[in-house]
């Protein structure tokens, strides 16, 4: 079937139809991977290292010491993943964080109902920050506004380019934001956990002898992964559900596993992280192409998720259950794959579900203004803003 006449239920694709060329090199020398089989082989192999998620920002942290877990490879990475895995298992998430998620959803949506209107992405960020802060251990800030300080890391002012004065300004802005985050949020949270360790990431890092700067670096990494991306996921799912009464009724009438399956299918269609970047550490043969050592490889998550070989017919239409676990799993590559697959996938699905079931039950829920779709360089994907909701 011609892809141009297939149903396309995506909201954030900027009108682009995924290419069906599985592996190709562009004029700049970057290799693009769009086929599921090639992408999975690359991500599950040991011939690449991480090359995305603001690696240059992390490298700017003065005296950062230990390599952040996001950028570790091989045995050290496997060991750190083993040690942090207990924070993210479905059983741990359900036992430790479900009551917190319910309280946060009640608070955020209660404020929305009292005011009669609210901005959806800000509500999603408040929810995401509250959950991730508890998991990481950023719960003892000197003042409110953790969400704004996290957002600031990935706002303008951190990109390379421009003249010398602009680069100096960018460096100063970045350092100021790092120091502000450290002194207001990270340092007091570390002090609280030195006095009384808890079941969270900061306590785990301190037990391993991490310094203040090393803990700061990990908090930036978890801030990006656990807060910024979850905000977009919540917002895009709400957009689909509020706009489609039948889909909303199906979601609210389903049991939890079926609701989770629908959210995972929406994430397959609308992956928050649009591209996974890797750099080869040795020559790699992929999809019949010979990729040299040191090459940049960009895995196009949108295209991979829409590969008919894994997602079947009409891959741009919503169809929960189309990708069973033995084939790829419902989100396909939306949470990555291989050693660096997102450990917080179940956390994100559960908190989105708890928030959305509460939000969608609000009487008279409607958009005053649908989301504006923009671009987020950190995740090489969409960002949704100015999504104003109203209720009765």
For each feature predicted by the language model, list its residue ranges.
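Cytochrome P450
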Residues: 1-392
């Amino acid at each position: 079937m011609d892809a141009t006449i297939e149903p396309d239920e995506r909201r954030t694709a900027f009108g682009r139809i995924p290419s069906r060329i599985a592996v190709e090199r562009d004029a700049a020398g970057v290799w693009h991977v769009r086929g599921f089989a090639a992408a999975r082989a690359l991500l599950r192999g040991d011939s690449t290292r991480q090359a995305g998620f603001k690696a240059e920002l992390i490298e700017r942290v003065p005296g950062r010491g230990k390599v952040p877990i996001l950028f570790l490879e091989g045995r050290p990475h496997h060991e750190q993943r083993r040690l942090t895995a207990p924070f993210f298992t479905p059983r741990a998430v359900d036992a430790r964080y479900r009551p917190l998620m319910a309280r946060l959803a009640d608070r955020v949506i209660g404020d929305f109902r009292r005011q009669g209107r609210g901005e959806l992405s800000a509500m999603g960020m408040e929810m995401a920050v509250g959950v991730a802060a508890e998991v990481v251990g950023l719960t003892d800030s000197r003042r409110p506004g953790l969400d704004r300080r996290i957002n600031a890391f990935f706002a303008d002012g951190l990109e390379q380019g421009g003249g010398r004065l602009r680069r100096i300004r960018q460096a100063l802005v970045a350092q100021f934001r790092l120091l502000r985050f450290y002194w207001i949020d990270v340092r007091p949270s570390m002090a609280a956990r030195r006095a009384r360790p808890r079941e969270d990431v900061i306590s785990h890092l301190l037990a391993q002898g991490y310094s203040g700067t090393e803990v700061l670096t990990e908090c930036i990494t978890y801030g990006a992964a656990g807060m910024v991306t979850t905000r977009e996921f919540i917002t895009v799912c709400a957009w689909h559900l509020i706009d489609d009464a039948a889909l909303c009724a199906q979601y609210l009438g389903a049991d939890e596993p079926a609701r989770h399956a629908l959210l995972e299918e929406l994430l397959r269609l609308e992956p928050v992280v649009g591209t996974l970047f890797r750099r080869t550490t040795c020559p790699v043969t992929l999809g019949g192409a010979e990729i040299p050592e040191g090459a940049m490889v960009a895995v196009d998550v949108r295209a991979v998720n829409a590969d008919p070989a894994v997602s079947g017919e009409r891959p741009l239409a919503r169809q929960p259950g189309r990708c069973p676990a033995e084939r790829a799993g419902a989100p396909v590559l939306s949470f990555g794959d291989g050693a660096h697959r997102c450990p917080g996938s179940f956390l994100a699905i559960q908190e989105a579900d708890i928030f959305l079931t509460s939000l969608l039950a609000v009487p008279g829920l409607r958009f005053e203004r649908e989301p504006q779709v923009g671009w987020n360089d950190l995740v090489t994907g969409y960002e949704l803003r100015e999504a104003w909701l109203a209720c009765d």
